[in-house]
Swiss-Prot record:
<comment type="similarity">
    <text>Belongs to the thymidylate kinase family.</text>
</comment>
<dbReference type="InterPro" id="IPR039430">
    <property type="entry name" value="Thymidylate_kin-like_dom"/>
</dbReference>
<feature type="binding site">
    <location>
        <begin position="10"/>
        <end position="17"/>
    </location>
    <ligand>
        <name>ATP</name>
    </ligand>
</feature>
<dbReference type="GO" id="GO:0005829">
    <property type="term" value="C:cytosol"/>
</dbReference>
<keyword id="KW-0418">Kinase</keyword>
<dbReference type="GO" id="GO:0005524">
    <property type="term" value="F:ATP binding"/>
</dbReference>
<dbReference type="InterPro" id="IPR027417">
    <property type="entry name" value="P-loop_NTPase"/>
</dbReference>
<keyword id="KW-0067">ATP-binding</keyword>
<dbReference type="GO" id="GO:0006227">
    <property type="term" value="P:dUDP biosynthetic process"/>
</dbReference>
<comment type="function">
    <text>Phosphorylation of dTMP to form dTDP in both de novo and salvage pathways of dTTP synthesis.</text>
</comment>
<dbReference type="GO" id="GO:0006233">
    <property type="term" value="P:dTDP biosynthetic process"/>
</dbReference>
<dbReference type="InterPro" id="IPR018094">
    <property type="entry name" value="Thymidylate_kinase"/>
</dbReference>
<keyword id="KW-0545">Nucleotide biosynthesis</keyword>
<dbReference type="InterPro" id="IPR018095">
    <property type="entry name" value="Thymidylate_kin_CS"/>
</dbReference>
<keyword id="KW-0547">Nucleotide-binding</keyword>
<keyword id="KW-0808">Transferase</keyword>
<dbReference type="GO" id="GO:0006235">
    <property type="term" value="P:dTTP biosynthetic process"/>
</dbReference>
Amino acid sequence: MKAIFITLEGPDGSGKTTVGTLLNQKMTEAGIDFIKTREPGGSPISEKVRNIVLGIGNEEMDPKTEVLLIAGARRQHVVETIRPALAAGKTVLCDRFMDSSLAYQGAGRDMNMEQVLQVNLYAIEDTLPDRTYYLDVPAEVGLARIAANKGREVNRLDKEDITYHEKVQAGYEKVINMFPERFMRVDATKTPEEITETILADILRQLA
């Protein structure tokens, strides 16, 4: 069985983390040799950067600082975690990757998406995902889910208003148009179990 690099993307409240947990279980049951990781984070240094970027109390962070910190964390994640796993024949399942920077920082912060893309391509070099699953849900539905989920850890980006999250969604649409060959859009208004089964079926096709 070949190894591929898979990413999960979606706006806040899309159920991505829940689906990732279910996928972890289903992929294990299917006998897939893989690791599950996340961004920002995924390596000891990158997790420290995550705490800075997402920490409540860092609201004064400049948008370009945010882009550069996340790109730096991503570089370390690629070098320390993702590439070694792929080289060892393990599939990588990652909760968020470069596309999140394009949507959240590029579009959400009204920055030049091409510049954000170039910074990230410099960081990751040739380590692009083979397959990206975009969990598609309206911004207002996602934010309502966040508000209803009292056990969810709320980070600095969750506290942004609906306008910001709508910009993020528009940004994702631009990213999908940039890389249509690797994206699969998944209806995230369905149950986490239904979403997981849809994604798992496609993963098995990709690995065949």
